[in-house]
Each structure stands twice: as C-alpha cells, then as structure tokens.
C-alpha cells in the first residue's frame, strides 16, 4: 500500500449550498495536495452528485453514507448501488455504529452490502468498532473479529481481490462526546483487524482509524504502523479543518 486514506463523512449535515462551498474550496486547494494521501469526502445523499461533479477534475474520491444491497425494488426510502454508480461515486460507507445502533444494521446486512458494493465496482469502507462495555469486559478483539468476518462473508474468491477498506471506529470514541483512543490502543486493535481480514482475503487491506480525530492527535495516529489513514468527523466538516489535518499528516508522512 502506497497511500494513506484521509477523508470525512458529513453525516446528516450540510445543505447543498454548503456542500458546494466545501467542494469548491477543496478543489481550489488541489494544487497543494500530497501525492502520499488519497483524499475522500462522503456527503449526504442530497449533495453527492453535485460534490462529485465539482471535484471531478481532482483525485478526491466521493462516496455515500449507506446503500441497500438490492439493485432495485420495493425498498421504500433506500438507495441502491446502481443509483450510487449513476452518481459516479467511488466509495460507500457501510456498517457505521450509528446505523447498527439506530437502524438495525447487522453483520449479516453489512456482508450483503459489501458484496453488492464490490459487484458494482464501488469501494466499500467498512466501519467496525467495539462498545465501551465490550472493551471493559475484554471482548473487544472478539467483537472486531465477528464484524470483520461478517462483512467479508458474502464475497466470492474473485471478489476478495477487489479494493476494500476498513475503518476502526470504537463506539466510545466517536461523536461529540467521544474520547479519542490512544495511538497505542488504536494501533493494537488495528493490527488485530488487519490480521483477521488478511486471514480471509489472503492479503493486507488498508485500515483507517476514526474516532475523535483532530488536529492535536492526527500526526501521532498517522505515524502508527497499522493505521493506514484517518476517517474524520466534525474536525473536518469545515474545509479549513480538513485541509489543516491533511497538511499536518502530509508533513508527518513525508518525515517518516
């Protein structure tokens, strides 16, 4: 792997006008991009097509925050992989803990979605992470293994060669009141995730860290041997914040 992945999901934030302003500012700063970093942005569904169009002349990948596994049908309120491809998207975020907690997402449904994403040429960004209860009871490693294996369980041998990303987001570390994991703790968990994924896929795939990433901890995190990128929340919802973290990480990566 030659690149670090650093991107942000906006969750349920930004109007179309706000999304356009962010994308235009990111495009305007494109000349200062680092060749060592693959950037990505995941807007809400209502802005993905426009954001992708604005960033089409750059290397920034654009994604969606969820999708259904079916191509079409009676799934009121859902978005299909074909619809994402129609928007020219590159990535789809799957299995976020908020979807698992509030919308009934399971390891089974994440697996179905991962297979559908790969089948349609989308890069699945698979979110996994243990709760505080899991961590305190010593079940973190077991929970993460279950989530990794579940996410990859529907892939054929050929599909296992597709581009796949994981994002380790400990549930207790994300959100407005989240407590960032220490770099050592995150790196240890990510080593476990990478090992399990490698046992299934027979190759190493990138694993990003997400969970209260900010300008104060991004450099320490990106320097860890098993952290292949950062999945940023509110610290990157302002384009200046995103560009700041990108610049800090680029300097750190080049120094290493």
From Swiss-Prot:
Compartments in which it is found: Cytoplasm
Functional summary from the UniProt entry: Catalyzes the isomerization of D-erythrulose-4P to L-erythrulose-1P.
Record organism: Brucella abortus biovar 1 (strain 9-941)
Cysteines joined through disulfide linkages: none
Alphabetical list of InterPro entries matching this protein: Aldolase_TIM (IPR013785), TIM_sf (IPR035990), Triosephosphate_isomerase (IPR000652), Triosephosphate_isomerase_AS (IPR020861)
Top-rank lineage group of the source organism: Bacteria
Annotated residues for binding of substrate: 175, 212
Protein name in the entry: L-erythrulose-1-phosphate isomerase
Active site, per annotation: 96 (electrophile), 169 (proton acceptor)
Gene Ontology biological-process entries: gluconeogenesis; glyceraldehyde-3-phosphate biosynthetic process; glycerol catabolic process; glycolytic process; pentose-phosphate shunt
Record's GO cellular component terms: cytosol
Any single Pfam family the record assigns to this protein: TIM
GO molecular function: triose-phosphate isomerase activity
Record keywords, A-Z: Cytoplasm, Gluconeogenesis, Glycolysis, Isomerase, Pentose shunt
Family to which the UniProt record says this protein belongs: Belongs to the triosephosphate isomerase family.
Catalytic activity: L-erythrulose 1-phosphate = D-erythrulose 4-phosphate
EC number: 5.3.1.33
Pathway assigned in UniProt: Carbohydrate metabolism; erythritol degradation
Subunit comment: Homodimer.
């Amino acid at each position: 792997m030659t690149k670090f992945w650093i991107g942000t999901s906006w969750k349920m934030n930004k109007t179309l006008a706000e999304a356009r302003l962010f994308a235009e500012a990111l495009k305007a700063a494109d000349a200062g991009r680092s060749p060592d970093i693959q950037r990505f942005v995941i807007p809400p569904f209502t802005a993905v097509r426009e954001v992708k169009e604005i960033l089409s002349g750059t290397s920034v990948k654009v994604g969606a925050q969820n999708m259904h596994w079916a191509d079409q049908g009676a799934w009121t309120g859902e978005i299909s992989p074909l619809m994402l491809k129609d928007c020219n998207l590159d990535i789809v975020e799957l299995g976020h803990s908020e979807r698992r907690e509030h919308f009934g997402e399971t390891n089974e449904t994440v697996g179905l979605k991962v297979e559908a994403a790969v089948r349609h040429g989308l890069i699945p960004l698979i979110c996994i992470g243990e709760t505080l209860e899991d961590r305190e009871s010593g079940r973190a490693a077991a929970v993460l293994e279950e989530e990794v294996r579940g996410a990859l369980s529907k892939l054929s041998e050929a599909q296992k060669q597709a581009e796949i990303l994981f994002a380790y987001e400990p549930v207790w570390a994300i959100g407005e009141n989240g407590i960032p994991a220490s770099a050592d703790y995150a790196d240890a968990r990510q080593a476990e995730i990478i090992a399990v994924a490698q046992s299934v896929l027979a190759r190493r795939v990138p694993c990003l860290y997400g969970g209260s990433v900010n300008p104060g901890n991004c450099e320490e995190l990106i320097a860890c041997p098993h952290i292949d990128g950062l999945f940023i929340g509110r610290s990157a919802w302002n384009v200046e914040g995103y560009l700041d973290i990108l610049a800090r990480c680029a300097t750190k990566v080049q120094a290493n």
